[in-house]
Structures are given as structure tokens and as C-alpha cells.
A protein has these predicted regions:
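Short, surface-exposed, charged amphipathic helix/loop patches that serve as local interaction elements
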Residues: 20, 25-117
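Short Lys/Arg-rich cationic patches that frequently serve as NLS/NoLS or arginine-rich RNA/DNA-binding motifs
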Residues: 1-9
């Protein structure tokens, strides 16, 4: 029996002025939304974690779940979760600010119930 093709969520591209392109998924599962809600409410954080720790974890969580690829200054796009997360952790303050703005913009448009940090 032939397999049905898997549903692929639509993706949206966001370009910066330096040849960079961030591609974000257009869908979030109910389980992902619930897990994000627990992080935002502090339920899935380590004991003693600060508000800033929670904010950073929420940002990283959305980044992990939504980013399909990230092209930086026209270089080969990063696609694996490991590469993407590693690059995020070495991102400059300006790059992080740009990423946060894109995640907020994307969530506002596609997931109004998900409030990005």
C-alpha cells in the first residue's frame, strides 16, 4: 500500500538587509503550544530559575520549534537543529534582537494565542 505524503506546514521567509534569511514554520502542534505554555508559566523551569532564565528558555524553545533554516550573510543555510541552536547561542546581541522581533512578528500573525518573549 502506498503511503500518503506527510503534511508539510507552510513556511514563511524573513530577510534582513545583509543577505540573511530566516525561514519559520507556519504551524505549531497542540502539544508544542502546551509545552510552551508550561515554560512561560514557569512550570517546566528548574527550581530557583529566574524570570530572565524563563524568558531565555521560552525564546530558545520557540526558536527550536519554529526555525526551518537560517541563512546568515548569504552563506549556506543552517538546517539541522544542532547547527541552528549552536549558532543561536553564539549570535550577537543585534542578531538576537532581530530574531526575537521576527519570532514576535510571526507569532502575532500566525499564532495569536502564543505570546513570544
Amino acid at each position: 500500500m502506498a503511503r500518503r505524503p506527510r503534511f508539510r506546514a507552510p513556511s514563511v521567509e524573513y530577510a534582513d538587509g545583509d543577505g540573511g534569511v530566516l525561514v519559520l514554520r507556519g504551524a505549531l502542534s497542540a502539544g508544542t503550544r502546551a509545552a510552551y505554555g508550561r515554560i512561560v508559566n514557569g512550570q517546566d523551569l528548574a527550581p530557583g530559575a529566574s524570570r530572565e532564565d524563563g524568558w531565555q528558555r521560552a525564546f530558545e524553545f520557540l526558536f527550536e520549534r519554529l526555525v526551518v533554516s537560517w541563512t546568515i550573510a548569504g552563506a549556506e543555510p543552517l538546517r539541522s537543529e544542532r547547527e541552528l541552536l549552536g549558532r543561536l547561542r553564539f549570535a550577537s546581541a543585534d542578531e538576537r534582537a532581530w530574531l526575537r522581533e521576527r519570532l514576535r512578528e510571526h507569532c502575532t500573525q500566525y499564532f495569536p494565542d502564543v505570546h513570544a518573549p
